[in-house]
Amino acid sequence: MNHLSPPPSPHSQQPSPAGLGCHGAALDKQWMQRASAFNTVIASAAAQKLNGRDLPFLYNPLLYSSALLWPQFLLSSATALGTPLTPMTPKSPASVVLGQRDRDFALTPEKEHELQMNNNNENSKQDYQEQDEDMPLNLSTKERITSDDSNRDQYHSSSNNSSRSSSSSEVEQLHPMTSLNVTPPPLSAVNLKSSSTPQQQRQRSQGNIIWSPASMCERSARREQYGLKMEEQGDEEEHQVDPIVRKFKYERRTASISSLQSPISSLSAPASNAVQDLEFEVAQQQLYAHRSAFMAGLTGNNLELLTQHLKLKSEQPQQQQQQHRIKDEQQQDNRSAAALMNLVAAAEFGYMRNQHQQPQQQQQQQLHHQQQPQQHQHQQQHPDSTATDVARRSSSSSSYQGENEEKRSGRNFQCKQCGKSFKRSSTLSTHLLIHSDTRPYPCQYCGKRFHQKSDMKKHTYIHTGEKPHKCTVCLKAFSQSSNLITHMRKHTGYKPFGCHLCDQSFQRKVDLRRHRESRHEEAPPVEDLKPLKMEVSSSSC
C-alpha cells in the first residue's frame, strides 16, 4: 500500500521547537478546521451513498493539509453519481449541528424559526411519503401537478431563500469578526416540489382521469355534490330577496297590466290636471270606450267602417282591371281606325285609277275584237307559230297600246286555244292542261282532281277548316285570298266593276253580269267554236 500513498504536501512542514509555543493557538485552530472538514466529507459521502470502504482513502488529514481541495475531488465523484454540477463548499459546524445546545454560537430568532420550520417540513414530507408507499395504487385518484402548484412552490421557495439571505446578512452584521473565520453555507439546489404545508387535494382535470370503478363512483358523487350546492345557492338567493324589492316588482307588474285596461289620463297626466281640463278627460274616456268596444267585438260604427274598408279593398283590383281593359280597347280602336283610313285612302286611289282606265279598257276591247280575225288568219297560215308580231303591230297606235306592247314584249308564248300569252313555256304547258282536261293533282280527302297544285291546296282548306287569310278590320278569316280581297271592298267601298250603259258599279264581276241580264236584257255571249280537247306532251313545250 506504500505505492498508493500520495506525496507529502508542501504546506505540511514540521514546525520548529522554538515556534511551537508561539504558534500553538494557530495549530489548534488549524486542527479544528481539519476536523470540521472531515465531518463535512463524511456527511456528504453518506448523503451521496458512497461505499464505506472508500472513506479511509477519500480523506486522511495527515496526507492533505488544506480542506479546500476536497470539494474539487468530491465534484468528480458527484458527476459520476449523476448529481448536478453545483459548486459546493465545506459546511460549517453550524450547518451540521441541528440542536441549539450542541452549537458553539447563537443565531437570531428569525434564523432559529426558519431552521425549525425546515426541520418540521422535512419530517412531515417523510411521513407523507411513507404513508403514500403504504397506500395501494389507485389510478383514479392520482394527482397531477399543474402550473398553479408549480407557481405556488416557486413562491414558497423564493420566500424561503429570501428569508435565508436576509437572516445571513443580519448575522454578518451582528458578528462581523465571526463571519470572516466561519465558512459560508453550501449552495443547495432548489426543490420546487417542497412546500411549507401539505397540499390539499385538488380537483383533477378531465385529461388525467383513468377509468376505474373508483373513478366512476367519485364522478357520480362529485356530480351529486355539485347539484346539491347549486340547489342550496338557488334557495339562498330566493330567501335573500328583499321584501321591499319584491313588493316593488309586484307593483310594477300590476301597474303595467292596469295601464292596458285604464284610460290614458291615468298615466299621461296628473289627477289635478285631469280635473281641471274636463273636456280632455271626456275625450279620453270616449277614446277608451271606443277602444274597449273595438277590443270587445268591433261593434257599432267600427264594424261598418271595417266592412266599407274591406269592400273598397276588394273592389280596387276589379277597378284596375276595368281601367286596363278600357285602355286596351281604346288602343285597338285607334289601330283599327288608322288601318281603316289607310284602306279607304288606298280604295280611293284605286277607284280614281279605274275611272281613268275605263275608256282605255273599252278601246282595248274594241281593238281585240278587230284583231281576232287577223289572228285567226295568221294561225291558219302558221299553225305551229306562237309569236304575236301581228298583235304587237296592231297595238302600236296609241300610248296605252305602246305601254301594253312593252308589257307584252316579253311574252313570247301564246296559247292556241284562247290566245293567252305567257313568258315561260312551263307556264304555257300548265295552262294547256285546262284545255286537255288533264288533272294530275287529286284531293286526298274527296278524290277531286285539279289542274294545278295551288288549286288542290286551296280545295283542301274546305276539308281541314283552315282559314289562313284574316281581315285586319273585323278579324274575319277566309280560306282563299280572293275571298279576302272581295271582302275588303266592303270596308273600303271600292267597286271596280261598272256598267257602261248606266252609272252603277259593283264589287264583284258576277254582280255586274247579273245586272246586265236583268236590267239591260243582255244575253250571255255564246261562243261559236267549242273548245277543243287536246293532249299536250312535255316535248311540245
From Swiss-Prot:
<dbReference type="GO" id="GO:0008270">
    <property type="term" value="F:zinc ion binding"/>
</dbReference>
<feature type="region of interest" description="Disordered">
    <location>
        <begin position="354"/>
        <end position="412"/>
    </location>
</feature>
<keyword id="KW-0805">Transcription regulation</keyword>
<keyword id="KW-0844">Vision</keyword>
<feature type="region of interest" description="Disordered">
    <location>
        <begin position="1"/>
        <end position="21"/>
    </location>
</feature>
<dbReference type="InterPro" id="IPR013087">
    <property type="entry name" value="Znf_C2H2_type"/>
</dbReference>
<feature type="region of interest" description="Disordered">
    <location>
        <begin position="514"/>
        <end position="541"/>
    </location>
</feature>
<keyword id="KW-0804">Transcription</keyword>
<comment type="function">
    <text>Transcription factor both necessary and sufficient for proper development of most cell types of the embryonic and adult peripheral nervous system (PNS). Essential component of the proneural Notch signaling pathway required for proper sensory organ precursor (SOP) differentiation. Correct expression requires expression of scalloped (sd). Repression of rough (ro) in R8 photoreceptor is an essential mechanism of R8 cell fate determination.</text>
</comment>
<feature type="compositionally biased region" description="Basic and acidic residues">
    <location>
        <begin position="141"/>
        <end position="155"/>
    </location>
</feature>
<feature type="compositionally biased region" description="Low complexity">
    <location>
        <begin position="194"/>
        <end position="206"/>
    </location>
</feature>
<feature type="zinc finger region" description="C2H2-type 2">
    <location>
        <begin position="441"/>
        <end position="463"/>
    </location>
</feature>
<dbReference type="GO" id="GO:0007601">
    <property type="term" value="P:visual perception"/>
</dbReference>
<protein>
    <recommendedName>
        <fullName>Zinc finger protein sens</fullName>
    </recommendedName>
</protein>
<feature type="zinc finger region" description="C2H2-type 4">
    <location>
        <begin position="497"/>
        <end position="520"/>
    </location>
</feature>
<dbReference type="Pfam" id="PF00096">
    <property type="entry name" value="zf-C2H2"/>
</dbReference>
<keyword id="KW-0862">Zinc</keyword>
<keyword id="KW-0238">DNA-binding</keyword>
<keyword id="KW-0677">Repeat</keyword>
<dbReference type="GO" id="GO:0000122">
    <property type="term" value="P:negative regulation of transcription by RNA polymerase II"/>
</dbReference>
<dbReference type="GO" id="GO:0000785">
    <property type="term" value="C:chromatin"/>
</dbReference>
<dbReference type="GO" id="GO:0043565">
    <property type="term" value="F:sequence-specific DNA binding"/>
</dbReference>
<dbReference type="GO" id="GO:0000978">
    <property type="term" value="F:RNA polymerase II cis-regulatory region sequence-specific DNA binding"/>
</dbReference>
<dbReference type="GO" id="GO:0003700">
    <property type="term" value="F:DNA-binding transcription factor activity"/>
</dbReference>
<feature type="region of interest" description="Disordered">
    <location>
        <begin position="313"/>
        <end position="334"/>
    </location>
</feature>
<dbReference type="GO" id="GO:0008594">
    <property type="term" value="P:photoreceptor cell morphogenesis"/>
</dbReference>
<keyword id="KW-0716">Sensory transduction</keyword>
<keyword id="KW-0217">Developmental protein</keyword>
<keyword id="KW-0863">Zinc-finger</keyword>
<dbReference type="GO" id="GO:0043425">
    <property type="term" value="F:bHLH transcription factor binding"/>
</dbReference>
<dbReference type="GO" id="GO:0007411">
    <property type="term" value="P:axon guidance"/>
</dbReference>
<feature type="compositionally biased region" description="Pro residues">
    <location>
        <begin position="1"/>
        <end position="10"/>
    </location>
</feature>
<feature type="region of interest" description="Disordered">
    <location>
        <begin position="110"/>
        <end position="216"/>
    </location>
</feature>
<feature type="zinc finger region" description="C2H2-type 3">
    <location>
        <begin position="469"/>
        <end position="491"/>
    </location>
</feature>
<dbReference type="GO" id="GO:0016360">
    <property type="term" value="P:sensory organ precursor cell fate determination"/>
</dbReference>
<feature type="zinc finger region" description="C2H2-type 1">
    <location>
        <begin position="413"/>
        <end position="435"/>
    </location>
</feature>
<dbReference type="GO" id="GO:0046530">
    <property type="term" value="P:photoreceptor cell differentiation"/>
</dbReference>
<dbReference type="GO" id="GO:0007219">
    <property type="term" value="P:Notch signaling pathway"/>
</dbReference>
<keyword id="KW-0479">Metal-binding</keyword>
<dbReference type="GO" id="GO:0007422">
    <property type="term" value="P:peripheral nervous system development"/>
</dbReference>
<dbReference type="GO" id="GO:0005634">
    <property type="term" value="C:nucleus"/>
</dbReference>
<feature type="compositionally biased region" description="Low complexity">
    <location>
        <begin position="355"/>
        <end position="383"/>
    </location>
</feature>
